[in-house]
Amino acid sequence: MKTPGHQRVKTARRRTAASTRWLERQLNDPYVQKAQAEGYRSRAAFKLIELDERFSLLKNARRIIDLGIAPGGWSQVARKKAPQAKIVGIDLLEAAPIEGVTIFQNDFTDPEAQKKLIEALGGAADLVLSDMAANTIGHAQTDHLRTMALVEEAAVFASETLREGGSFVAKVLAGGADKDLVALLKRLFGQVKHAKPPASRRESSEWYVIAQNFRGEAYQG
């Protein structure tokens, strides 16, 4: 992916050094530039594109749930790759409307919010996507554990929502508890793999778990 020369950002009077570094990274990130050029709301769209190219997640999907939908890049990709699919998403943050996608602004961990998702989908899901991460506090292990608890809840929800043979994809932060998640998924799915798509930043601890061929039995404690 070709990129223009590295752009530097002058530190404004009210801008911190950290925010200046973030802005400079954004300006020089080829995936940010490509997302803008192709009309995607975030560079994260290319993570799903790359995962789909490797694991064929969207081709035959008819019902899709997008957990942590904001700002909407993953659902944009799903809409494009699976135009026939019913797509339902949820996030604590507001996400601007996407044509053909039903969006709820709710806390996913609220059982009532999960009921809304299931009702709106109108049937068993073929694919549950989760790009969720807990709000960080700056303590690596605490951030890891909080995010993993969220992902495990997403996995349990997927087991209650997917059709037999369906798939679950989730963002994971490395740090130890991810091993428990993989063990859980191996009980629920016939195939569990992991990947770090090229669009994931090298310095990030994130990776993605891809669980396919759901066995058809909901998680039992």
Curated annotation (Swiss-Prot):
It holds the Pfam family FtsJ. S-adenosyl-L-methionine binds at residues 72, 74, 91, 107, 131. Belongs to the class I-like SAM-binding methyltransferase superfamily. RNA methyltransferase RlmE family. It comes from Zymomonas mobilis subsp. mobilis (strain ATCC 31821 / ZM4 / CP4). Its EC number is 2.1.1.166. The lineage of its organism: Bacteria, Pseudomonadati, Pseudomonadota, Alphaproteobacteria, Sphingomonadales. It is found in: Cytoplasm. This is Ribosomal RNA large subunit methyltransferase E. It is an enzyme of class 2 (transferase). InterPro entries: RNA_methyltr_RlmE (IPR050082), RNA_MeTrfase_FtsJ_dom (IPR002877), rRNA-MeTfrase_E (IPR015507), SAM-dependent_MTases_sf (IPR029063). One of its GO terms (cellular component) is cytoplasm. It catalyses: uridine(2552) in 23S rRNA + S-adenosyl-L-methionine = 2'-O-methyluridine(2552) in 23S rRNA + S-adenosyl-L-homocysteine + H(+). The active site is at 171 (proton acceptor). Specifically methylates the uridine in position 2552 of 23S rRNA at the 2'-O position of the ribose in the fully assembled 50S ribosomal subunit. Keywords: Cytoplasm, Methyltransferase, rRNA processing, S-adenosyl-L-methionine, Transferase. The gene is rlmE.
